[in-house]
Amino acid sequence: MTANALSEKKNSILEINDLCFAYPKEKKRALNHVSLHVEDGEFLVLCGKSGCGKSTLLTHLKTPLTPHGKRKGEILFQGVPIGEMSNREQSQRIGYVLQNPDNQIVTDKVWHELAFGLESLGYSNADIRIRVAEMASYFGIQDWFYKNVSELSGGQKQLLNLASIMAMHPDMLILDEPTSQLDPIAASDFLETVKKINRDLGTTIILTEHRLEEVFPAADRVVVMDEGQILCVGTPPEIGEELKKRNHEMFLAMPVPMQVYAKVESEQPCPITVRDGRKWLDIVCKKKGISPANAFSSYRKERDFQKGKSSFAKITEKFTEKFTEKKEDIILACDDLWFRYDKELPDVVKGLSFSLKRGEFFALLGGNGTGKSTTLSLLSRLRKPYRGKVLLEGKDIRRYSDKELFRNFLGVLPQNPQSLFVKKSVELELFEMVGGVKEKKDEEYQLAMDKKDAVEGIIKVTHLEELLHRHPYDLSGGEQQRLA
């Protein structure tokens, strides 16, 4: 063993040695010979396309979350096999923030949720107050500190979970796509807070994230996974160069400055941020004797952007004709909607009125807590306004039966896809939505076969062929969204 290897082992807070894992009834391994060391105080970013094994790997780093299946290999935390650590010790030293915020909330008040973990670990009231105040300040929770958890938006719930975990000051903090339900401003603020905690407290961070432009500048190292294996490990510039060399599709997810750098021959270091990219561009342009403003004019003309745009147009043309044909008839409308969660609380939706035409694609935008999810729940009759009404096909939505409304008119995809799942496998879940398939004769049998064809068709469209026997809760966040 080399001196460098000895040094790495000495400084490693986490070691994963030849880890393999397969879910029950699955021939293909979700993790295949994964080996990795994480240094104490390191900021490690784990990335890869949906279903590559990121979430599965992270769940193995805390035994209460580890899925059932066939497993071999070794995981050491500070030199101790992670399976030999008690749940209490893991709770205190290894923080874990899940993708789904509702899976971690256990109390009904925001302030109590912040304090719950510390109370469970036996901290004194004075320490609890200090740490709760610290986290509330970090995350800007002061304005909703005394609110009921049920009143929070998905983004606010995730912020609360993050603050609750960080209040325990763990040695290692694992975050599985923590900003997936935050708006861009809140996500940026949160990631800055994570960087600050890593710098000030020396907490080791293992983060999976799709907003790579936000996290790459803070990352000490990046791990790229593909098909259950580690594809490459290195600093952000090294990862960019390696993915470009392999012509791997993950290169398209790299920060824009890295993608621009890859198109130009240069001896300068690879830029990560826009600021670094501007400096690099100035140096390159000076050497070539051209203006930065005109540096890529010829490149824009020569690149295959127009070809790609043309191909995209061809692909979407048939969908445009079928689904977005301009029509004047209004399919959904709301008139002067008002809603609040309690008589004593302020209104969340205030005098909202708008209409939606058939075939129209309508985007409802806004920051966390602005009433987006509440509005959608009113439009789908999941909540009832205390004033105003919703019209569907010109008819008051309250006059539709549940079966008629949700079978013939509305499909609702919730923020949390797990709220739809009721079966033990992906395949059973899909058949449940069409009423199941039973072999019968004549017309009933034909109806059952039509349902089977419908399910098989949607399986191909959403690329779920290899996941049919998997439990819905064992899927990654992206796979759960596709199933939902």
Region roles according to the model:
Residues 225, 229-268:
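Conserved beta-strand-loop-alpha-helix hinge in the C-terminal portion
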Residues 148-152, 156, 471-475, 479:
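Conserved ABC ATPase signature
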Residues 70-81, 90, 388-398, 406-407:
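Conserved ABC transporter NBD signature motif
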Residues 6-16, 21-33, 65-68, 86, ...:
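A short, flexible loop at the N-terminus of ABC-type nucleotide-binding domains that lies
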Residues 126-144, 334-337, 431, 446-467:
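Conserved ABC ATPase "signature" region
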Residues 173-176, 182:
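Catalytic Walker B motif of ABC-type/P-loop ATPase nucleotide-binding domains
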Residues 62, 380:
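Helix-to-loop junction immediately C-terminal to a conserved catalytic motif
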